[in-house]
Design a protein with these regions (language model features):
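Conserved structural motif at the start of ABC-family nucleotide-binding domains
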Residues: 1-3, 16
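The feature captures the beta-strand-to-loop junction immediately N-terminal to the Walker
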Residues: 32-34
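Helix-to-loop junction immediately C-terminal to a conserved catalytic motif
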Residues: 47
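Conserved ABC ATPase "signature" region
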Residues: 83, 87, 93-110
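Catalytic Walker B motif of ABC-type/P-loop ATPase nucleotide-binding domains
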Residues: 139-143
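ABC transporter nucleotide-binding domain
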Residues: 157-241
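Short, charged/small-residue-rich alpha-helical element at the C-terminal edge
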Residues: 210-279
Length: 281
């Protein structure tokens, strides 16, 4: 799937502006941003449920879409929902494939019960199962772990990993559960003020956060004015927090060369939550 210069306007309001990215087969990509920045609008455009004001989408015809609040036939069983959609889309019900998915999603004990008896999390897992009826090449998932406890979330994430790895499905996930995005996604797209920015995801690609306390305002100001190691993401009195892909030894060498006195120094790996919060300031 390729998104080319996609923009969306509602009257004078610009929701999306010149969005460009690709979703490759076998890749899992995260989409994050504050409420109301256009994530759901972008997803609807990707599956042709909404039209862009300008730009193009190059995509397979076989795209599965999970909305944040999926609609299910509550008076029917899970299996009846599944067979109904198979018939609606004109595809054969693949008992072997869906028997395996039902088991992987821990739905075996629920699949023959009426959906109205399901918990929110079980409904969500059934909704994900239904998006797989057509064996899509691409999946667009809006809050796929919504309503799920930690154990059920892990079950869903494992299924998504298997789909990407073994069936070469490209998956775009929007979620406020940043820990899920961090665990499963190879890339993350930040939607901010109608624009997309990119940030690699994964333990090996994260920067470090350095919390540095200086002995004086002069030392602090010299460091801020001269350093080219990374971004200052927080400044409070004599203490700053900096994000950068550098070694602590490089910083201490810089301190010594510039006669900068430091009274406290801490470092930790920057998480996706850190990145998100820093970008949202």
């Amino acid at each position: 799937m390729e998104v080319i210069n996609v923009s969306k306007h509602y009257g004078h309001s610009i929701i999306l502006k010149d969005i460009n990215f690709a979703l490759n087969k076998g890749e899992i990509v995260g989409l994050v941003g504050r409420n109301g920045v256009g994530k759901s609008t972008l997803m609807k455009i990707l599956v042709q449920n909404n039209q862009p004001t300008s730009g193009n989408i190059i995509s397979s015809d076989n795209v599965g879409y999970l909305i944040e609040e999926p609609k299910l036939f509550l008076s029917k069983t899970g299996l009846e929902n599944l067979k109904y959609l198979s018939n609606l889309y004109g595809v054969d019900y693949n008992q072997e494939r869906f028997g395996s998915l039902i088991q992987e999603l821990d739905l075996t004990q629920y699949i023959n019960k009426k959906v109205k008896t399901y918990s929110l999390g079980t409904k969500q897992k059934l909704a994900l199962l239904l998006t797989l009826v057509t064996e899509p090449d691409m999946l667009i998932l809006d809050e796929p772990t919504n309503g799920l406890d930690i154990e059920s979330s892990q079950i869903v994430l494992a299924v998504l990993k298997n789909l990407a790895l073994h069936e070469n499905v490209g998956i775009l996930i929007s979620s406020h559960k940043l820990e899920d995005i961090e665990e499963i996604c190879e890339r993350v797209l930040f939607l901010e003020n109608g624009l997309l920015t990119f940030q690699k995801v994964g333990k090996d690609s994260h920067n470090c956060l350095f919390e540095i306390a200086f002995s004086s305002a002069t030392d602090r100001d010299i460091f801020i004015s001269k350093q080219e190691f990374g971004d200052i993401v927080q400044e409070e009195g004599l203490r700053i927090t900096m994000s950068g892909n550098i070694q602590s030894s490089e910083l201490f060498k810089f301190f010594n060369e510039n006669s900068i006195k430091v009274i406290d120094f801490e470092t930790k790996k920057e998480t996706l939550k850190d990145i998100y919060l820093n970008r949202s300031k």
